[in-house]
Amino acid sequence: MTRTRPQDRTQPPQTDPIRALLASPPDLPVVEVLPELRERLSPDPSASDDAGAGACLVLTAPPGTGKTTLVPPLLADVLTDVRADAPQRAPGRVVVTQPRRIAARAAARRLADLLGEEVGGTVGYAVRGERRAGPDTRIEVVTAGLLLRRLQRDPELSGVDAVILDEVHERSLDSDLLLALLTDARAALREDLTLVAMSATLDADRLRRILGGSSEGSSGVAPLVEVPGRLHPLEEVWAPPGHTGRLGPRGVPREFLTHVAATVERALTERSGDVLVFLPGAREVDDVVSRLRGAAPEGVDVLPLHGRLPASAQDAALAPSPAGRRRVVVSTNVAESSLTVPGVRVVVDSTLAREPRLDVARSMSGLVTVGVSRAAGVQRAGRAGREGPGVVYRCCSTTDWARSPLAPTPEILSADLTGAALELAVWGVPDGAGLAWVDEPPAAALAAAREALERLGLAGADGVTPLGRAVAGLPAGVREARALLATAPVLGARRAARATALLTADLRAPGGDLTALARQVRGGGAGSGAWKAEARRLEQACRRAALEQPGDPEAPDFASGGPQAPDTGRGREETGSPDAVGEGTRAHDLESAVALVAGTAQPQWIARRRGPAPQAGKEAHYASVAGTGLRLPAGSALAESEWLAVAGVDLTSGRGDALIRAAAPLAEQAALELAGAWLTEEERTVWEGGRLRTERLRRLGAITLTTTPGPPPGPTAVAEAVVARVRAEGADAGLAALPWDEEALGLRARLALLHEHLGEPWPDMSDAALAERAEEWLAPAVTSLAGQAGGANGANGPGGSASGQGSRRFNLERLDVAQALRALLPWPQASRLDELVPERIEVPSGSQVRVDYTAAIGGAAGATGSVDPAEAGRAGRPVLAVRVQECFGWAATPRIVEGRVAVLLHLLSPARRPVAVTDDLSSFWEQGYPQVRAEMRGRYPKHAWPEDPWNAPATRGTGRRR
């Protein structure tokens, strides 16, 4: 494929810093494979393209082997040679992706330092809100998410000759999605694009197949280059927390953080060198840092390292220790594989990690703290063995370690896929079909994400909407970006951007209170610099989008009565003249604006407090519109607020309430407007003792706003309530509430026997089946009974009485259950019911004796009619209880159900007590009867006990002794 460029770049100078670095590289293990890499990465000269087809390659290398440092310059040098053979084309850039912003900046600085340059020259970087690159940049380090947006804007990646996907073993959602789209673009548009995937631990086979198949018509596998590691001996020390667990029902216990800090102090005493501590999140990092700074020995510096810190603080943590001093670097998993922390000889691992999760049952997505995988734990430990013998202190037991998963769960299998679904819709493959995935996105999670996009007005049956395309182009999450565009016409672009930045700048809200965070950053406190930079970036993006995208027709109509947003319950301030996106003359201050933006971003998380405000220092619990339980951190100032707009949560590993990590107070009216799509009114009929009561409920999703009495329930409502009660109490208990008389029990047993032996269309009589089909047989009977004046509204009769507003008494005892069951009889087979399972059988005496069919179901029906489906038709047989004298001369045992079932005869004494049980009369007369006769003739001398029962006449009463 031949491409033309707007202008040619200047050829590299005579003294090429990249070539100089490769001529004298640092002593790193990757140097051993550089010749092989150069050979593998040289494009195929046999390709039709004038520069040859781009290479694809998978590189596996342990952390610390130098792959991020030396592979990008090697590839840039290879491409320079290629372009020298094709002078009509200027060399393009090598773009290197990193999973995190901090890693991208650090990698670029490290490489630029080796080249003897400042960042922004030969080597640059670009992350969200910051870019240092220029026209001479040949290697650019970016985050996967940023390259994903570039690829969506320009699928050909103009000006890029190679992409290196670094740390792909971390399996971030952006990284997996980027790999799928890059291979798709390469196959269709850019066969000359070189792709390299670099991994520390991932099984490379799947990657090799994906990259090997990214050329049109190719079905091979990409070559694999393995870099040997040079880890020094590593000692393991197990430091479990004793009786204190690593995880409690509400996250990481403070007692465990105390244990981690104590383990660090122990390591400082027992070992030499710097200490690297791994904790699951920024909150835990700051907690342990504060503990250690007050207890660390003289000459020890304690430094935090996480993504929320300013770049200067991150750089300080990554710098070598000053002479004569030791460092303790307390980090999240950012230092796990993609960063180099020099001087580390000791690792203290909390063995915990924080990962994104989609909780389908609770309709929530958020971060959850889990035990670290063994693969990640090994990587953490390896940080101690790069410069010499090291040691890892693991804050768990060997049993816990053995139970740890082998590898972390890929985000694509566990996280919310709404953002990924929007990217796929913009790419033109909403279902992801045809893309090469390391792991395909789960169908259910992707379907839920696509439904969410439709609700947000970002995608539909015809693909991505203009609004969805605008949202995808904004440097923020899907919901936050949409909230920015939706609220800008009301708040103004600047105020909306400032409020949205409180949600997206990765700042910690004190006590989960976004309004407190707003006051903090507005007053120049912690995080103010990051917030201002984020706000400026969002404002610029919002104004660009406003010029290209008309208003969102799906957004809440806040401005229907003028440029007023819902009253969130906070104060207002005057604004200047309207700006380009329609800033009104009155709008909320920052504290009110963040409530509006948060409620617009996550309306399903708007929540109302359960009960009164808690006592000081206690947790407040809330119920959300989506029905999920939420809780504030203990002592949060937000606990006084009845309503909250919740923007972020941390999930617990159990089923407890999710922890609110970002929220703002909200007035009830604002909550109703922001979550108006969930506002409903309904009537329901409920049981209260023996009385049925109708309620009118006004609800905001799962939140009940008001409950008022309704009119007395009509017959249909009564029937629905009875059916609901049967199901709600469980099939067996619910059916037991019905008045099962002998006729109903018998009919049910007869039908159960037919279903067992003849199958369909004879109905299943099990508890579960009857409950499932209750609308067919039970509801009509209840409706009919409730419609009878005496059956439901009689003043004092057995049907009950109507009394109390919105209620009526309904007496189930009047229900004819047998008649109700007949509604299930199949037609025309119903006419054969008495033939197949007769109620009575005529015996030789002429008596019509009732058959006991309940015995055929093992007596399980009992007095309640409850049938165990596992026993139905198998625990016994129908019983015919008849006196011996009425059966004289009867040779053949009666059979029913087309001869399939023999009736079990209970032969009775004159006192109607069983003297024999048989289903073989012939054998009984020959073998059993003589003994019965011998025992009974003296006890009942007035009754016939003939020696020859075959020929004796059957009799109902007493007879002369024979």
Task: Show the residue positions of the predicted features.
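P-loop NTPase motor module signature
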Residues: 1-479, 483, 553-557, 561-562, ...
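Short, surface-exposed polybasic-aromatic patches that bind anionic ligands, especially phosphate groups
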Residues: 841, 845-851, 913
